[in-house]
Amino acid sequence: MTRVCRALLFVLCGIFVHAQENELHFFGPRTDVLVVFTASREAQERETRAVQQLRLLVQDFEHQTPDVSVLVAITAHDHPPVPDFVPVDRLTGTKKLISLISSYKAPIVLILDETTGPPRLHTGAHRTVCPPWLLQAVYQHLTSHHVPIRYRDFDAILHRLGWLHEDPRHALYIKEHIPAVRMENSLYPPGALHTLPALLTQVYSEEWDTHYVSVSYGGTLYLIREQFFVILILGAVITLLLSLAIFSFLSDSRKRHYWNTILAMWWLPAILGVLSVCSVFVATQLTALFFLIRFGTHTSTGALPLLALIVKHSIAIALSCVCMANSKTIRDSMLHNGFIGGYLASTLCLLYAVLFSVIDFSLSAVFALEYALSLVFFSAQRKTTRRIMLAMMFLLFAPFLYAYLKNSAVTAPLSFHQSNVFFALGCVPFMLFMLTLFFEREKSHPRIPFIRRRNLLLSGALLTVLVINGVLWSVSLSSTRIPQEITACYRISERGLTLSLHSPLPIPRHIRARTHARLSTAEIQKAQDHLQISMDSRSYFGGRINVLEVRSQLRAQAIELRITSPHGTAAYEADRPFTRLEQGSVVRFISQARPPLPFTVTFSGDQNSTMQVQATVWTYDNPLQDAPPVMQDTTVRFIPMFELTRDVLFPSPSSQGVHATPEKNACIRDETVPNLQE
């Protein structure tokens, strides 16, 4: 049986036709550029202010038809109201919309969201930002219509670093290489959105520069393009070569002195780099250990991300200071050749302008500015000037530090798994600057013993660790005032009843326990009577078309089907997306959230094959008379949920006379479709 025949059969029989759940409104003639306004209903399918704004926009377009292609789409089932552990098809409406607009040559998407704060423009997701022409056009158009849109110029860099929360719908458009921006506002003035499609059609370009930086001033948005950063990196390389060649213009004695000092101190940045990386790695493991001891789970750092970052980096700084203070080699080298520390640090800044451009081109500009400040630091003779330059370098990275801590829910997973090396290497120039100032002070104040300053430093590091651990042990994840929500999932199958607890926060030790309760066969059968499975089988072209239907007396939140064919392929094609497992002998279907009942799946399979069907339904309705008790606690609020699983065996059509009916409430009907003449 060929795939063409199966597809033809599906079309002829009309077995599956799913209702379009997205609300679509097309306006204007069909052109290459399609401007899409879209918003999503909430989890309870309630219309948000953004959806209401789109309905007003539809009325405007009906009154005055645009001259370009415009689509107003209200998507459904993007925010399923089920816990994360329930396997449902998420972002269903957005996926359908993407498959629809992909037929156009140049779709442009504007996502509308409501907000309680000031209007804001979001340009990035999936570590990518929208094209610069789209950002500039939308920003200046809204400001010209007196919409006080808020856009932080620094957000473009943070989006590329992955340090900001991203909307999953926006990420889907970016992954499909569809230009998209997300606008948060409660209400737009009349005409602000109506005239936007014509402007976007005029400024559309296939160019997609992802490494730009924006500067907004006076209602105008200025863009620094990618070419600037390429030239900046080339300039950094040329400057580095010139800084090495400048030694040839020095006198022989000074040249020899500088080269001897550099050759004697070349190892210092390498040692500090290794020390910084090791300190951050050890601090990461110690922080995870402290949180494990305190909360009892390895994932507890995600529950308190800001505290986890503060603990980790405080320990890393303390370890680095302790190691540097106790290193006699570093002390002797800096006392005799301390002047070269600033030069080595400035050279590192120049190298980092090239190295960190691998992460993001715009970071090369930041390190180029740090290099300029480090040159002043190195050449300055007054200590006050050096301290001012060091403070300015700290201020240069202050926005990164603020965003790093503010968005700790996003940056903490990166910090604990991916970004340790780059973060540690980025601290090396500051370590060199601090060492230079520290040992210059020792030279100017020889009466203060070094051992006293070292002990003071060690005492400060130890006190920092003790204070942090005291704060850690005083923090609680839940309280009687704000109880922790835990989903208690009762799993009912032929094996009996099990209870599992799920929560985005770590579950306390005295509550985190799995209960294995026993149910009698009669109780299991009574619970499974709420779930009926039937299959209609049709023979066609040497194969079979199967229509599997799941009915439930319970209000289903999600449904999962696993179809197993032990001696063949479970499914070749189907009317729903599915996943093949175990080389095709098992297929898996998952529904959207709150699927309409009965849940029907149509698929093609082998002519004579035995099928094992496992249906799982998640519901908040109780199929049992009495649910097993859960431990009561004033700091926890339990949400009961039930996972009902039923297995049904459908024998092959050739053996139906031998086998009995599969099960109660499970039936199979066999019909033969006459062969169609070609």
Curated annotation (Swiss-Prot):
The chain crosses the membrane at residues 228-250, 263-285, 300-322, 334-356, 361-380, 387-405, 420-439, 455-477. Keywords: Cell membrane, Membrane, Transmembrane, Transmembrane helix. It is a multi-pass membrane protein. Its main location: membrane. One of its GO terms (cellular component) is plasma membrane. It is found in: Cell membrane. Residues 653-678 are annotated as: Disordered. The keyword Signal does not apply. This is Uncharacterized protein TP_0564.
